[in-house]
Design a protein with these regions (language model features):
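Basic- and hydrophobic-enriched, low-structure N-terminal and domain-boundary segments
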Residues: 2-211, 215-218, 264-270, 280-284, ...
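Short, exposed beta-strand "edge-strand" segments with a Pro/Gly-rich flavor and a Y/T-containing core
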Residues: 25-26, 121, 126-157, 275-276, ...
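P-loop NTPase motor domains
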Residues: 46, 51-56, 122, 185-188, ...
Length: 726
């Protein structure tokens, strides 16, 4: 029969390995040093005992020479004098010399016997490489401190260092901050520590539905994160629990972008509404448009007029997401030609009807409901002072033959009748539509309009008609921005293209314009940003996310991606996905699928344990037993043990009463066997969550200008009107 020695393996308690000892069960370095010490003490004790005995028998004769020191009136001699200077004296007393040596042996014997026994019992055990089959282990406190998930505890040496007056730079215990990745209970003290990650690296959390990831990771993070963030929020629960604290206490702009919710006025005098608007086409850096950027030299925002060099690129990026929301590429002729047409139409609309340039207007223009040529005529007439030709606004929507649109696009003129930099896209698209046969042109047009069907919903059309904020303002505002991207479960699939468009533009626009000074990159943003994307794979394949994770950290963006299962991630991105490999920290709750459990076990690795084999031969009094021990490999945590990780304990109403277990993997470090943190068990976090969510969303921009800039101008006008008023 076989018996496995599992003292070094326990899923609950981390084994304390030094990480430097390469022997499995042989004598350690400390044991070797102790054996050497025992032998040395034994030799010293034997010679000292023999020397003192010989001297006492000669009544400490003066002929013995000087003593090392005295204990009372008793002289203590150098222990090895019986081998050196006392040699002639010992020869004169042969009987006494035998007794002296016998006494010396007795003085050494106890220490040498102890050393031999220790050596016997340790050498009787298996020797070899301690990590023969694997070196996996659970992380201890020092490992977790090295991962920077808990603050470094000041050691005695650190405290002594701080007391020295000539050390001007003191060692400080870092205050914990960052996103929550779990909690850990110290097996020595029983103390529970929150694990918080504040580095630029990304995080992937794998947790089934109703497993406690919201109350354990998402809510605590949103109630402590002091910088900007974009959070996907299904049903608006996250917004309700964390929006109040972020606006009232964290001093952030509170923005609730819920495309499918009816816009209602909250405060007419202040122009406040329940949801914010966002127009994707206003993100295009068109020629003459305004952009607000961060100036690292002055640590402030600066206003910049765009020169139009990035207009075509921005338009193509937006149209790509509209035409190919699944990220599968433009596979057929109709999709490719529709893409070309939409790029040209957006550029044309941007320069001929900039005040109404949105996707709903774009679909109306393609339906022949907007005559851009007439708009140009009226605008040019108004600029020349001819007001007689200006009709009601309803005339802007007069129907027109769509063929006239292709003619107008092919001219490449803006509403002032002048050519513009990005006109090539409009000219080419218009000319190609003119040259196509009617049937083909009709098919291209119908394909293009089919991609815009989402924006025929009047609620979505209103909420995307203009922008109360721009994406770059999330990281480049005078204070951080808390942006909640809210979708109802019934609208999740329908709104998926718009949500993916928003996220893709965040990754595109916020990861640009890196500057360098003295051979190093400098910060190109005012506030760093967290992307908290819950149920990330349910959005569909966001190819831009998979491509961007490798470099967006350098632009101040940190992604926190949450999925229910690894199979869900594989379904959207394939087995060779690069999302998990670009996430420095991987968090796992108890899985429901064996595929995910196997991944967890593989990540934890293999450890080396001892296996004892015992065989019995014979019987009765003649029975004999032989034992042998060998090293064998074992998964640090097996697949079935992963699936049996303790789940949260819930009451009959489904409320969590006791946290469950979790595994945290950090690149290059041992795995952490942790417990789930619960925000409502922390009085401070619970108090923050009880702050009422604002009814109205904040507005950062109005007509493309910062609200703060407009208010400052109005304030200055009032001062100029009343120069003597205090």
């Amino acid at each position: 029969m076989a018996k496995k020695y599992n003292e070094d393996y326990d899923i609950r308690i981390a084994p304390e390995f030094s990480g430097q000892d390469s022997n499995l069960r042989t004598t350690s370095k400390s044991q070797k040093y102790f054996l050497i010490f025992l032998v040395a003490v034994g030799i010293y004790s034997g010679f000292q005992t023999a020397t003192q005995y010989f001297a006492s028998e000669l009544q400490y004769s003066p002929y013995l020479g000087n003593a090392m020191f005295y204990i009372g009136d008793v002289p203590i001699y150098f222990p090895f004098k019986i081998l050196t200077s006392w040699g002639d004296i010992i020869k004169a007393y042969p009987n006494l010399s035998e007794e002296t040596y016998s006494i010396g042996y007795c003085g050494s014997a106890p220490f040498l016997i102890i050393a031999l026994l220790i050596k016997f019992f340790t050498s009787n055990k298996l020797s070899g490489n301690r990590f023969l089959h694997g070196s996996a282990r659970w992380a201890n406190r020092k490992d977790i401190e090295r991962m920077a998930l808990i603050p470094h505890k000041l050691t005695f040496e650190d405290k002594v260092y701080n007391l020295m007056p000539w050390h001007k730079k003191k060692i400080k215990e870092i205050k914990p901050e960052g996103v929550f990745v779990g909690a850990w209970q110290d097996p020595k003290t029983g103390e529970v520590k929150y694990l918080r990650h504040n580095g630029p690296e990304h995080i992937l959390c794998v947790a089934p539905t109703r497993s406690g990831k919201g109350v354990g990771l998402v809510n605590p993070t949103m109630l402590t994160w002091m910088y900007s963030f974009v959070a996907t929020d299904l049903k608006g629960e996250l917004c309700a629990l964390t929006g109040g604290w972020n606006k009232e206490c964290a001093n952030k702009y509170y923005i609730r972008f819920e495309p499918a919710k009816k816009r209602q006025c909250i405060d007419e005098a202040k122009g406040l509404y329940n949801v914010a608007r966002w127009n994707p086409l206003e993100e295009i850096r068109a020629e003459g448009s305004t952009e607000y950027c961060y100036d690292h030299k002055t640590d402030s925002l600066k206003k910049r007029i765009c020169d139009g060099t990035k207009e075509t690129a921005d338009t193509q990026n937006i149209v790509t997401q509209i035409v190919d929301p699944k990220g599968e590429g433009l596979k057929d002729h109709w999709a490719k030609t529709a893409y070309e047409l939409l790029v040209g139409c957006v550029v044309h609309l941007k320069h001929n009807c900039p005040e109404k340039c949105n996707i709903a207007t774009l679909s109306l223009m393609l339906a022949g409901q907007i005559d851009t040529a007439k708009i140009r005529e009226k605008y040019m007439a108004s600029q020349n002072g001819d007001t007689s030709s200006i009709d009601d606004e309803s005339d802007d929507s007069d129907t027109m033959d769509v063929k006239n649109l292709w003619e107008d696009m092919a001219k490449g003129l803006d509403r002032e009748g002048k050519p513009y930099k990005a006109r090539d896209a409009a000219i080419i698209a218009g000319q190609h539509m003119k040259d196509r046969p009617n049937e083909e042109a009709g098919s291209v047009l119908s394909t293009a309009t089919s991609f815009l069907s989402l924006y025929t919903d009047p609620i979505i059309a209103e909420n995307t008609s203009c922008s109360d904020f721009r994406i770059k303002q999330i990281m480049n505002s005078d204070k951080p921005v808390a942006l909640y991207l809210v979708t109802e479960p019934t609208d999740k699939d329908r709104l998926s293209p718009l949500v993916k468009l928003f996220i893709s533009l965040v990754l595109t626009l916020c990861a640009s314009d890196m500057e360098f000074e003295k051979g190093r990159s400098v910060k190109s943003y005012k506030n760093k940003m967290l992307l908290m994307l819950d149920e990330f794979p349910s959005l569909g394949k966001v190819e831009k996310m998979q491509e961007s994770l490798a470099f967006i950290a350098g632009y101040g963006m940190k992604a926190y991606l949450i999925t229910q299962d690894m199979a869900q991630l594989f379904d959207k991105y394939g087995k060779d996905e690069s999302i998990s490999s670009n996430c420095h920290v991987n968090i796992f709750y108890a899985p429901l699928k064996t595929e995910t459990a196997q991944i967890m076990s593989d990540k934890a690795g293999t450890t080396t344990i001892l296996e004892e084999n015992k065989s019995i031969s014979g019987g009765g009094l003649k029975a004999s037993t032989s034992r042998s021990m060998q090293a064998t490999g074992r998964a640090l945590i097996t697949k079935d043990e992963c699936m049996q990780l303790a789940a949260p304990v819930k009451d009959n109403l489904g409320n969590i009463q006791k946290p469950g277990e979790m595994l945290i993997f950090t690149a290059g470090q041992p795995a952490i066997h942790g417990i789930q943190p619960l925000y409502f068990q922390n009085p401070l976090l619970l108090k923050r969550a009880q702050i009422e969510c604002p009814a109205a969303t904040d507005i950062i921009l109005k007509n493309g200008r910062l609200i703060s800039e407009i208010e400052e101008e109005e304030k200055q006008k009032n001062i100029d009107k009343n120069p003597f008023e205090i």
